[in-house]
């Protein structure tokens, strides 16, 4: 009986350990080629003309989008007069940020789910992507708030991001990766850790925009990173159940799509857009990850592998 009881206990412990492992999936960091990554280069004015009607059509089909947008419009009307905004920044851009940062509903999650999976083809985007106007307004808001030039205009933002439900791991140091969605981060490490520790990111972003003044939750001191920014993996370690990832922006974006709503087809490669003053094209040399050890690369001494296939 003692042996049977012991075997039963061991069996339960094994099942519990297996459940814990499966409860936090491991996802590889990559260039996520199926992300819808349009940056609307050269067509932002035409998209501004079309996005208003497009938004009305999409709100008619999506109740949560309509409710969230209308609530954010009201909040923006009270917030707007307190803000100093860049030239070209319109009410729709501010409302889009307030819609995204309102985590009291699931719309931000639904948007990012669509972004991560909606870039298989232009046909897929046109038929099934339900947030075309919101994606445009949010992308444009970040471009206007951040300004052109990336880190050639300044050192960028050092930010942190905590994830509680997923383990993200790079394949190797020196890889180029994208986050593949609109990614919330904070300049305050303590704030970021409140969102989880399964994976903890340390990042330097050149295209993420500080949105604290526009956010529904300004105390989070948020910097919002666009889906198409390219990062260099400079560090990875595991501390028990926690993965710690260090990403250093290469001061570059890349996109498979450009002006898709206006007819632009998906391109085979991820076409890079370099910021002014960016270093020359990088070497493909990289170091392999070693399990259980902390590996770090000095981003000033390592060049990035090509962003597109």
Curated annotation (Swiss-Prot):
Protein EC: 2.4.2.31
Pfam families noted in UniProt: ART
Binding site for NAD(+): 100, 161, 181, 215
Residues annotated as glycosylated: 102, 197
Superkingdom to which the source organism belongs: Eukaryota
InterPro entries listed in its UniProt record: ADP-ribosyltransferase_ARG, ART
Residues of the signal peptide: 1-23
Keyword vocabulary terms for this entry: Disulfide bond, Glycoprotein, Glycosyltransferase, Membrane, NAD, NADP, Nucleotidyltransferase, Secreted, Signal, Transferase
An MF annotation (GO) of this entry: NAD+-protein-arginine ADP-ribosyltransferase activity
Annotated tissue distribution: Abundantly expressed in testis. Lower levels in cardiac and skeletal muscle.
Residues at the active site: 161, 184, 222
GO CC, any one term: membrane
Residue ranges annotated for the TR mART core domain, each copy included: 63-253
Catalysed reactions, as listed in the record: L-arginyl-[protein] + NAD(+) = N(omega)-(ADP-D-ribosyl)-L-arginyl-[protein] + nicotinamide + H(+)
Disulfide pairings: 43-259
Protein localization: Secreted; Membrane
Family: Belongs to the Arg-specific ADP-ribosyltransferase family.
The protein, known as: Ecto-ADP-ribosyltransferase 5
Origin species: Mus musculus (Mouse)
Lineage, highest ranks first: Eukaryota, Metazoa, Chordata, Craniata, Vertebrata
Gene: Art5
């Amino acid at each position: 009986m003692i042996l049977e009881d012991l075997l039963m206990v061991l069996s339960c412990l094994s099942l519990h350990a297996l459940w814990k492992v499966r409860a936090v999936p491991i996802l590889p960091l990559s260039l996520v080629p199926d992300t819808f990554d349009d940056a609307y280069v050269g067509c932002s004015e035409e998209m501004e003309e079309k996005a208003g009607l497009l938004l009305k059509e999409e709100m008619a089909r999506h109740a949560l989008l309509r409710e969230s947008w209308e609530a954010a419009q009201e909040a923006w009307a009270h917030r707007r007069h307190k803000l100093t905004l860049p030239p070209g920044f319109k009410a729709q851009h501010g409302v889009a940020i307030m819609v995204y940062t309102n985590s009291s509903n699931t719309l931000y999650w639904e948007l990012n789910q669509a972004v991560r999976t909606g870039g298989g083809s232009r046909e897929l985007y046109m038929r099934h992507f339900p947030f075309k106007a919101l994606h445009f307004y949010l992308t444009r808001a970040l471009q206007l708030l951040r300004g052109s030039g990336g880190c050639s205009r300044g050192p960028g933002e050092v930010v942190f991001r905590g994830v509680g439900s997923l383990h993200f791991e790079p394949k190797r140091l020196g890889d180029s990766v994208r986050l593949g969605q609109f990614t919330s981060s904070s300049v305050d490490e303590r704030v970021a850790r409140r969102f989880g520790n399964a994976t903890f990111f340390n990042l330097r972003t050149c295209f993420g925009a500080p949105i604290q003044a526009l956010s529904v939750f300004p105390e989070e001191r948020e910097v919002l990173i666009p889906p198409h920014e390219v990062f260099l993996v400079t560090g990875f370690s595991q501390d028990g159940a926690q993965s710690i990832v260090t990403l250093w922006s290469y001061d570059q974006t890349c996109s498979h799509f450009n002006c898709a709503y206006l007819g632009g087809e998906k391109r085979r490669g991820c076409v890079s857009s370099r910021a002014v003053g960016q270093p020359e094209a990088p070497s493909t040399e990289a170091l392999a990850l070693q399990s259980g050890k902390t590996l770090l690369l000095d981003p000033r001494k390592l060049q990035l592998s090509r962003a597109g296939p």
